[in-house]
């Protein structure tokens, strides 16, 4: 089951509300004429279809029929249509959609002016055409598709009322409202009553951040190891060069001692080299002496060239 499906499953376990039903009718509903006015509400999610059916019964005592058919002959996706014949006209009147469903493309004004209905409307909008990327796999993105630009921009206005900076873009003859910041997505999930999904999203976000931190730490450590290996090899090459030129014996005793210890322990760390000296020496002291050897070798190479 996808992350989007998990969210929608959680949302359909919530109480029936007029605002959620209103959004589903507004976004997925269509009217027809068959022995009177009919209303069809279409979805590809079986749980959402049952939720619509339940809300119609509980809120308006409207009896509907759920019809199932394949999306296309080649598609495995099923389409669920909640079909209403008796009471369709009265229901649209109750929802204040009798005229606006066919004439108005935006979110009804009374929804935008009611704090509680707005939240429920957002829940219905996500059930209708919402999608959420799995936070464990890729980028953070929550989106809601609208057929009409006006509706998408009205949703954007509602999002902003709740402090969510949503954007709207056109894609494949649809208007897509989306959030791409993890914190705002979590706030939206809380707003529409999907607390389990919010916690799961947050857990995935934390795990991704921890893995990212571990990878960066590993890269940093690997870079340091590579740097240390290169420095050790440079010092060993310098010592061998000085030894071949009979220059090593001319150097001060402290440099001869570190040269001997370095050659005898090519894989030792700087700290370990310091502990092998008598008396022992700190890392900065060891590095200083090794740099002196490298400088001596470089100066001799310049003279020879």
Curated annotation (Swiss-Prot):
Domain of life where this protein originates: Bacteria
Disulfide bridge positions per record: none
Alphabetical UniProt keywords: Cell cycle, Cell division, DNA-binding
DNA-binding region: 269-302
Gene Ontology biological process: cell division; regulation of sporulation
SUPFAM superfamilies named among the record's database cross-references: Homing endonucleases
Coiled-coil annotated residue ranges, if any: none
One Gene Ontology molecular-function label: DNA binding
Role description: Involved in cell division and chromosome segregation.
Family: Belongs to the WhiA family.
Protein name (record): Probable cell division protein WhiA
Native organism: Lactococcus lactis subsp. lactis (strain IL1403) (Streptococcus lactis)
Taxonomic lineage from the root: Bacteria, Bacillati, Bacillota, Bacilli, Lactobacillales
Gene field: whiA
């Amino acid at each position: 089951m996808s992350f989007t499906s998990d969210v929608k499953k959680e949302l359909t376990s919530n109480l029936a509300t007029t605002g959620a039903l209103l959004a589903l009718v507004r976004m997925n509903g269509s009217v027809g004429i068959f022995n009177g006015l009919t209303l069809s509400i279409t979805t590809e999610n079986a749980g959402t279809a049952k939720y619509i059916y339940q809300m119609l019964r509980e809120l308006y005592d409207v009896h509907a029929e759920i019809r199932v058919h394949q999306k296309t002959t080649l598609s495995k996706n099923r389409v669920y249509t909640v079909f209403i014949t008796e009471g369709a006209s009265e229901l649209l009147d109750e929802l204040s959609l009798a005229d606006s469903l066919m004439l108005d493309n935006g979110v009804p004004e009374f929804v935008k002016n009611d704090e509680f209905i707005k939240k429920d409307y957002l829940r219905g909008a996500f059930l209708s055409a919402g999608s959420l990327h799995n936070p464990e796999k890729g980028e953070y993105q929550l989106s809601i598709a609208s057929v009409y630009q006006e509706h998408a921009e009205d949703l954007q206005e509602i999002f902003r009322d709740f402090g969510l900076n949503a954007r709207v873009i056109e894609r494949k003859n649809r208007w897509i409202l989306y959030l791409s910041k993890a914190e705002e997505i979590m706030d939206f999930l809380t707003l529409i009553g999907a607390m389990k999904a919010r916690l799961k999203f947050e857990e995935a976000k934390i795990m991704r951040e921890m893995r990212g931190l571990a990878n960066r730490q590993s890269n940093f450590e690997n870079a340091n190891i590579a740097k240390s290996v290169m420095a050790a090899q440079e010092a060993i090459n310098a010592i061998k060069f000085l030894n071949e030129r009979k220059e090593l014996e001319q150097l001060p005793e402290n440099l001869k001692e570190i040269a001997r210890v370095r050659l005898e322990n090519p894989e030792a760390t700087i700290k370990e080299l310091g502990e092998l000296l008598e008396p022992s020496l700190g890392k900065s002291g060891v590095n200083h002496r090794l740099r002196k050897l490298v400088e001596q070798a470089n100066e001799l190479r310049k003279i020879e060239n």
